[in-house]
Amino acid sequence: MSTPISPFMARALALARAAAEAGEAPVGAALVRDGAIIAEAANAMRALGDPTAHAEILTIRAAGRERLEDCDLWVTLEPCAMCAGAIAHARIRRLYWGAPDSKGGAVEHGPRLFHQPTTHHRPELYGGIGADESAALLRTFFAARR
């Protein structure tokens, strides 16, 4: 029996599945304030012709505010250095992610951005939520392209 996941991670996973169907790497994100999703996005690098169009970046932009200190970000994959930097600059309160990313991740892998003394903001960190489903989406997507 699988463990139920948060409805916010469930939404991020639905966005990731839609991204895969559109030919994008399956990553989705949802930004939550006061128990409600206020912004969401999936990877759209191919669709937008923009290498910075990661789900996290697009979600932060969609929120339309410089500071998001009262918000939590749910994302299906451990954020990369670019996205972790944006999360720090936006001062997001809590970061929840699904699958770890041993190659490109920057939270618990690689530069471990939020553990650096020069990082000006460190959100509360919660990894591994919905990790199995997130990892399966990524494996299936990339296996079909190799």
Please place each PLM-identified region on the residue numbering.
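Short beta-strand scaffold segments in enzyme catalytic cores
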Residues: V27-G35
